Amino acid sequence: MHQLKKLITVKVIGSGEKTVVLGHGFGTDQSVWKHLVPYLVEDYRVVLYDNMGAGPTNPDYFDFERYASLEGYAYDLLAILEELQIDSCIYLGHSLSSMTGVIASIFRPDLFSKLIMLSASPRFINADDYYGGFEKEDIDQLSQAMDTNYKSWIEGFAPLVIGGDMDSVAVQEFSRTLFNMRPDIALSVFRTIFTFDLRHFLCRVTVPCHIIQSSKDLAVPVAVSEYIHQNLGGKSIVEVISTEGHLPQLSAPEVTIPVLLRHISHDITSNAAP
């Protein structure tokens, strides 16, 4: 971890007996939680970190082989918890990081009291028995567009994912953090995420899971959250919030933050109501 600590920006703030660890998704960094953190610091110890490859990290140290699968990110997360001597945490992961939490919790279930999964998907590409929202050809076209002109790709991709136009603050913020990534790293991470199939991991998860997503998300159809719920190995609950876009914590914080706070503070009860 000492080497990892030099590469990944880890921030620990707040006070409280319980620890909340926040993991961000593709194209963002820990700043994506800026609307949530002020509501946590009085009651919780809060840990924020940047995934390797995110803008604030040193691109020269990005290991393309290590991060060609989510296990690399999961090992980083476990190393952070070990270094900070965290023996139990509430883990809130967005998109990519929600599945990182899934894998890490399989390796070390004792370290996680629960997972909160925001805009999560175990597979983005459709299969015969599964609707992920994309065809392989869609991903190939997006990858090609990224490779051809990264800046132009961001201008088209960011509004679609956020669910707004280029003038919106959330789209501008997502565009900024996307642009901060080195293009070849962004392309590698994009391909890793959009071609993985982690469905087989779900049944091995024993930690309670809170699954939250927007009612309209271009990247994650509502059916995906229900699929996760039905296939997890432990207790789980789904909440679909009346927001649009893949990053509701950024685009609609007034709706999303109260929901996240409720799931952080309340556990799943026997009647599956948070």
Swiss-Prot record:
Active site residues of this protein: 95 (nucleophile), 217, 246
Activity regulation (UniProt): Hydrolysis activity toward yoshimulactone green (YLG), a fluorescent agonist to strigolactone receptor, is inhibited by (-)-germacrene D and GR24, a synthetic strigolactone analog.
Example GO biological process: response to strigolactone
Free-text disruption phenotype from the record: Reduced stigma size with normal terpenoid emission but reduced seeds number per flower. Insensitivity to (-)-germacrene D volatile signal leading to unchanged pistil tube size and lost (-)-germacrene D-mediated SMAX1a degradation.
Keyword Transport carried by entry: no
GO cellular component: cytoplasm; nucleus
EC identifiers of the protein: 3.1.-.-
Class of enzymatic activity (EC top level): hydrolase
GO molecular-function term, one example from the UniProt record: hydrolase activity
Induction of the gene: Accumulation in the stigmas is inversely proportional to the quantity of volatile organic compounds (VOCs).
Assigned protein family: Belongs to the AB hydrolase superfamily.
Record's subunit section: Interacts with MAX2A and MAX2B in the presence of (-)-germacrene D, thus forming an E3 SCF ubiquitin ligase complex (ASK-cullin-F-box) containing MAX2A or MAX2B and KAI2IA recognizing SMAX1A; this leads to the subsequent degradation of the transcriptional corepressor SMAX1A, thus triggering the activation of a downstream signaling cascade.
Record-given protein name: Karrikin insensitive 2 receptor IA
Organism: Petunia hybrida (Petunia)
Taxonomic lineage: Eukaryota, Viridiplantae, Streptophyta, Embryophyta, Tracheophyta
